[in-house]
Swiss-Prot record:
Full protein name: Recombination protein RecR
Organism encoding this protein: Rhodopseudomonas palustris (strain BisB5)
Protein task: May play a role in DNA repair. It seems to be involved in an RecBC-independent recombinational process of DNA repair. It may act with RecF and RecO.
Family indicated by similarity: Belongs to the RecR family.
Keyword flag Membrane: no
Gene name per UniProt: recR
Keyword Glycoprotein annotated: no
Residues covered by the Toprim domain: 83-178
UniProtKB keywords: DNA damage, DNA recombination, DNA repair, Metal-binding, Zinc, Zinc-finger
HAMAP family (UniProt xref): RecR
PROSITE patterns, per the entry: RECR (PS01300), TOPRIM (PS50880)
A Gene Ontology BP annotation from the UniProt entry: DNA recombination
Renumbered zinc finger spans (C4-type): 60-75
Amino acid sequence: MATAVAGPEIERLIQLLARLPGLGPRSARRAALHLIKKRDALMTPLASALQVAIDKIEVCKSCGNIDTRNPCTVCTDPRRDPSIIVVVADVADLWALERASATNGRYHVLGATLSPLDGVGPDDLTIDALVARAHDPAVSEIILALNATVDGQTTAHYVTDLLQEAGVKVTRLAHGVPVGGELDYLDEGTLSAAMRQRTLF
């Protein structure tokens, strides 16, 4: 029977850190020890940054990005091309495309992809808002930058069908994105090439 080596507050910190993507119990324990050892240099500023995030970060009412501004920095950037809307499943995908400087269009975050097995249906996504945006006369192209997974492609087909009446060109990323691949894990060169080689969907 294992005995406790730390108080409940430290155990709680470890449990919370273990919930983060990529951190298991062992990594969370190491991270907690590091934070505690670097209390002034790291833990206190991190706690402050987390509190600011809680207080100030919100979801952009226009595109679904997260930012401290609403509408977000991307939506209010006058250098952006308002005729192009790049559709992504998640904010992480938007950030991946931005790191690659792959487009100067605006974005629309669906919030997920259709996944019947996970109970994610059309009503769980922001598809209605996308269709409404597509009817704006200033919009001429919708780029589907969705993961090359079964769920991503199912979502792309579903969205394409709904966008037919809007009369906009619907394109998707080129097949340089590997099947089964997720945008957030691709390098910038691959993302840039895929954006340049997009095709009609």
